[in-house]
Amino acid sequence: SRYDALFMTYSQPIRWDWRLMAAQCYQESTFDPSAQSWAGACGLMQIMPATATRLGLSHDKLFDPESNIAAAARFLGQLDRKFSDISDRGERLNFVLASYNGGYHHIRDAMALARRDGRDQHRWADVSRYVLLLSTPRYYQDPIVKYGYMRGSETVDYVQRIRQRWQSYSGVRGGT
């Protein structure tokens, strides 16, 4: 994309493959710097205004490609550190992407459900099932769940699509 140099620059401090950031950007906005979602997310990396404020990104810079990518990289780095309990880097990437899309606390709720049910809370294959279940009352009303309902199918699909596009951008065939 025309933003690859920015992905290369801002992915380095967080030790991400720049092609993964590019794949995420495609999923977020199809590389449209003026994109705005129905929920109010803005710019290339679809940053919510409240998140932008927490990241030190002024609202007048939300649609600036470099500022938006730089802020998204800071946010991804923060999420990565919040999942330091997941030692496998490949697994951790799934949780970071899921949190970027669906919210950190919702993903932690799904992890708590997985743990309670004897599943591996550090494996996306196990936790993604609970992300999906957080759209059903039996699960989002469970006392262990602190943040309630989430549209889990969107988040699970988001992670899968980015991983697939990343493989494509990296020239990888098959695998995970």
Model-inferred region functions:
Residues 1-176:
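Catalytic glycan-binding domains that act on GlcNAc-containing polysaccharides
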